[in-house]
Structure formats: C-alpha cells, structure tokens
Amino acid sequence: MSENSNQNPSTDQDRREFLKALATVPVLGLFLVNLWQKLSRDKLKRANLLSDLVQEKKAPAVISGLSDSKHLNIGIIGYGGRGSHLVRGAGFATKGWTDATYENSKNNKLDKAFATFMSQEDLNCSLVGVCDLFDVRANQAIDASQNEVRPGGKPKKGAVRYRHYKELLANMNIDAVIVATPDHWHSRITIDAAKAGKHVYCEKGLTRTFDEALNVYDTVKRTGITLQLGHQNRQVEANEKAKQIIDQGLLGPINLIELTTNRNSPWGAWVWTIHPDGNSKTIDWDTFQEPSPNKIPFGEEALRRFFRWRCWYDYGTGLSGDLFSHDFDATNQIMDLGIPKYASSSGGIYFYKDGRDVPDVWHATLEYPEKDLTLLYSATLSSNDSRGNRIMGHDATMILGGQSNIGSVGGFIVTADQESTQYRERLESGVINTKYPIYTYSPGSKQIDGVTSATSQYFANKGLLYTYREGKRVDPSHLHVKDWLDSIRGGTQPKCNIEVAFQEAVTCAMATESYLTGRRVEWDPKNRRLI
C-alpha cells in the first residue's frame, strides 16, 4: 500500500476542472462543491484510517537464479491428476498437455495456463524415476520427463520406469521423491523413502490414520530428511496478507472461525472418469490394495475403486483429508492454531448413493479452550452456493473467498463490527461504516483466467490454482515444489514441514475418528494419543 499524501497534483487539477464546469450552474454548483469537498474529506479519512491501522508488508518476491545451485534428481511415485500437476510444478509436462494448452491460449486470451507454465523458474532438477501402477500414467510421466517444451529448455535426462516404488528408492542417484499416490500408501512410501535417505514431498493428507501419522513424524525426525506436505496454499499471497492483518490485531479477540466447502458436480464428488484402457493387464490391482484394510478381487468394482478411490475410507480420508485439510492448513498458517483439544463431527451420504462409504455432507467442530476459540467446518457436495470462510473477531470479521464478493480469486475483506470496542470512536464519527470494508485484498483481475469447470473454479477461489508475486501470476504448486527443493539445498525447513504436517494429520484424524465412532475425540499431547 502506498503512503498517502494530503497534496495530490492530479486531484487538484481534477478539482479545478470540476469547479470551472460548475461556474454556469450557480445554485446546483454550490451544492455540488460542498458534496465534492465532503467526499474528498471522507476519502482522506479512509486513507488515513488505513495507514493508521494497517502496517502492510510486501509479499515475498519470486527469487530466481538456481542455475548455479546443486542439480537434483527427483522421482515421482503416483502420476495421477495431482502427481502430474506437481511434476509440471517442477517443470515437466507431457507433450499432449503443452500442445493443448498452447492451442487453448491462442483461442482464449484469458487462458494463461501455458504462459504461466513457461514463465516458471527452471528449478535445476531432472525427473529421472517414475512409478505408477497404471501403465498409461507411467508412460505419460516418462513423456513429461523428455518433453523439450519446458522452462529452461531441453531436459538433461529422461526418466526410467519402476514397477514398484522400492525399486525406485533403491536408485542411489535419486535425491528426492514426490509421493502423490492415494492416501493409504502415503505412510509406507514416506517412511521407506526417509529410511533410504530420500527427501519427500508428500501430497496431502499426510496419512490415512492417526497411528500412521505418528510413525511418519518419528521417522522423518529421526532420519533428518526434508519433508514438504502438499498444501500449496502455504504459498498463497492472500494467506500471508491475512496473517499480517490478524497479527496486528485488527479483528480483536477471535472466538469463532467458520470454514466451508460447496461443490455440486459428480467430478467434485470424486466420481472421476474410469479410463477406457484400465484393465487387469494395465493396472497392478493387487499392489494397489495391499495396505487397505479390506481386499476385493479385480473386476468392475475394483476399477471404480481404483479411479475413484476418494469415495472409500479403505484408500482415502473423505472430506476431512481432502478438502477440510486445505482450509484447516490455511487457517493454521494464518493463526497458528495447532492441534485442537477436542473434535467432533457428523454427516452422511445423502446425495451420492453410489456405494461409497465417505459422507457427501459433513460437519466438524474443533475446540481450542486454551485459545478461547471454536472452529466450525461445513461441507456439502450437492450445492454450489459458495459461503466463503469467516474469521470472526470482537472488532471485525475477515471473509475469505465466497461471500467476500471482491470479484477476484484468493482475496478477502475485513469489515468492522457494529459493537466494536476498538473502532467505537471511528464508528460514532462515521469514519468507519460497517456496510463497507475497512480493508480489501483483491489480487489479480476480476476474471477467473480461463477456469471453466465448477471444480476448478472452487480451487481457484481458494487460491489453490494460482497466486501472485510482484503482480505476476504464479502456480502455487510450482512455488511449493521450489520451496521444497530450496530447503533441500539450503538445509532449511520448508513452509509445510513435518511439524505443521503432523498438526494437520492429527486434526483430520480426530475429525474422521469422531465421524466413524460417533463420539467426541480428545487429543492427549503428553502421551500423543487420542482419547
């Protein structure tokens, strides 16, 4: 935010031209002059209010120049929708993807996916190892490793396919791995990778169960590898701005937080396409279901579960680990909440009667008695009426996305409370009006840059598809992978390190446990157990 000045040459020039135009309308002119002066005073008051209240910091710059740093060899384990996005974040996309997005950019000026990808920093790494249990995806990952259309030009080397992840981990030339498998494989692969000395980027949620989270945490701490959990929201500029606002006390004491999810499409409810080439010859089903508590033979049901795994607790964590985890981690980033004392949740399968066992309507309550705070989460997969997220304080409320109505992605507004103690004098004098925000953060344009599907728009509104640095549109997944690689090279901790990853994993496990058992769950930090 620029500093405000009482003297503005352009304003003075506008005023002179305005007054000159009113010279021939004496009666109305006097009224409008008074109105002009009042509006100018109000504008100045609001400007002074913001400079008085908000001590704003700039977002971190996009630091480039890794060409002289250590070259890293990475492997990908699980090249599905999320895995392919993370590999693009590292600088590797399939030829089919680059060809399609290039054509889309020519036909639609708002579609900036290709330009955003090509303007990424070259992260000075090579994709050298691929493991996926579906032949089609494994071949796509190899194609991505060899595609010359990428930031930095021709890749140094291509990838080799491994049938089992342990074979990939045995390659001593691989420095780090991205784990983007279904949730039920996260803990095994992460633990084995850490024991093999590989750094790990693990997609969220960290684990499927609470016990797995404990094992992953202990192994990462013991081995000393660098772990980044896949919450790219840690790179979203709006969250950093929101933290600044809250740390400065603009909201006053905060006692209630409301987080929401609204989707209304089969895709948004994880009813994903069953690939026509998926069969017993192209899919290693036995390996896929190896860690799951319940096993079934390969067939039509197995195909559904392989491609729509988030619909079953055998493989995923439902709304808790998939969607709530994003909003919780963002709020944890903003407010340093940590693990709640109590968690309770309820819901049901009310709309998608397709054999799934995870709910499509789900609510959770997290209680922080030591912080005098309760967090509520409400989700439905059968209504697209976006409600946004609210952080409610005694003096003001922050609304992020959804109902903030700021016309941009990843933004927020702060509106004063009528009964505020902090703003009482300003409210009484009219300097602050509860109908208007006292602070608005609105990055980028009012367009949803080429995003068309409801699910993509949901992620865009959460700031998970792109963010801004120095006015430049950047993929937060790219920034998150970069943060991980920079931390590996520098021996530092990434933004979503094992400590905050553990907080997310335990919190989501508590909420899931409450739903499955129908009881309130308590966290015992001293003994590291759920009661």
Predicted regions: what they are:
Residues 2-14, 19-199, 214-226:
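N-terminal glycine-/serine-/threonine-rich beta1-alpha1-beta2 phosphate-ribose binding loop
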Residues 19, 87, 91, 139-142, ...:
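Non-transmembrane alpha-helical segments in soluble domains
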Residues 52-55, 240-241, 250-499, 503-517, ...:
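Contiguous beta-strand/loop segments that form the cofactor/metal-binding neighborhood of enzyme cores
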Residues 156, 180-184, 204-211, 230-233, ...:
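Alpha-helix capping and helix-loop boundary segments enriched in small/acidic/polar residues
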